């Protein structure tokens, strides 16, 4: 299954706010109407919607998300918490959380087009897993810095999660540590996602 490229507002109207996909927000009235039309949801549908929320927020294909779930299952600790940490530490998501890109798809484009350096080296893989002490910078070219400046200027300037530090005038972000689960940028019940996959495999 490929990455979703359809109308973004349609997805947030059904699943709720997905800040990684779009900075638009659903109208509360339309949320209530959708709930009343759908009636009582089955447990399967509830789990499916949480999984879809995770997939669309981080911009993953079904195969990619399943791969992350399998990695999380093999790691120590809560599978759901490890899954969220893996997704949050992706390079495209780190750029988004720093405000260097307005959405995760925009961050992915920056990486694909070789505008981003990690520890002084160009990285063109959006799924690159960042680690503590990584230094993320824009390439020292006018176009690269101009693209990031647009995002920094339009960023809502919310409090940065505690695992990141931004130095905007140097177009630089620092990864201080692995993300703490309370700073995950999406309202999600990750246990329902794990349950969904445990029933599929």
Swiss-Prot record:
<dbReference type="GO" id="GO:0009507">
    <property type="term" value="C:chloroplast"/>
</dbReference>
<dbReference type="InterPro" id="IPR018079">
    <property type="entry name" value="Ribosomal_uS4_CS"/>
</dbReference>
<dbReference type="InterPro" id="IPR022801">
    <property type="entry name" value="Ribosomal_uS4"/>
</dbReference>
<dbReference type="GO" id="GO:0003735">
    <property type="term" value="F:structural constituent of ribosome"/>
</dbReference>
<dbReference type="GO" id="GO:0006412">
    <property type="term" value="P:translation"/>
</dbReference>
<comment type="similarity">
    <text>Belongs to the universal ribosomal protein uS4 family.</text>
</comment>
<keyword id="KW-0687">Ribonucleoprotein</keyword>
<dbReference type="GO" id="GO:0019843">
    <property type="term" value="F:rRNA binding"/>
</dbReference>
<keyword id="KW-0694">RNA-binding</keyword>
<feature type="domain" description="S4 RNA-binding">
    <location>
        <begin position="89"/>
        <end position="149"/>
    </location>
</feature>
<comment type="subunit">
    <text>Part of the 30S ribosomal subunit. Contacts protein S5. The interaction surface between S4 and S5 is involved in control of translational fidelity.</text>
</comment>
<comment type="function">
    <text>One of the primary rRNA binding proteins, it binds directly to 16S rRNA where it nucleates assembly of the body of the 30S subunit.</text>
</comment>
<dbReference type="Pfam" id="PF00163">
    <property type="entry name" value="Ribosomal_S4"/>
</dbReference>
<dbReference type="Pfam" id="PF01479">
    <property type="entry name" value="S4"/>
</dbReference>
<keyword id="KW-0689">Ribosomal protein</keyword>
<keyword id="KW-0699">rRNA-binding</keyword>
<dbReference type="InterPro" id="IPR001912">
    <property type="entry name" value="Ribosomal_uS4_N"/>
</dbReference>
<keyword id="KW-0934">Plastid</keyword>
<dbReference type="InterPro" id="IPR036986">
    <property type="entry name" value="S4_RNA-bd_sf"/>
</dbReference>
<feature type="region of interest" description="Disordered">
    <location>
        <begin position="17"/>
        <end position="44"/>
    </location>
</feature>
<comment type="function">
    <text>With S5 and S12 plays an important role in translational accuracy.</text>
</comment>
<protein>
    <recommendedName>
        <fullName>Small ribosomal subunit protein uS4c</fullName>
    </recommendedName>
</protein>
<dbReference type="GO" id="GO:0042274">
    <property type="term" value="P:ribosomal small subunit biogenesis"/>
</dbReference>
<dbReference type="InterPro" id="IPR002942">
    <property type="entry name" value="S4_RNA-bd"/>
</dbReference>
<dbReference type="GO" id="GO:0015935">
    <property type="term" value="C:small ribosomal subunit"/>
</dbReference>
<keyword id="KW-0150">Chloroplast</keyword>
<dbReference type="InterPro" id="IPR005709">
    <property type="entry name" value="Ribosomal_uS4_bac-type"/>
</dbReference>
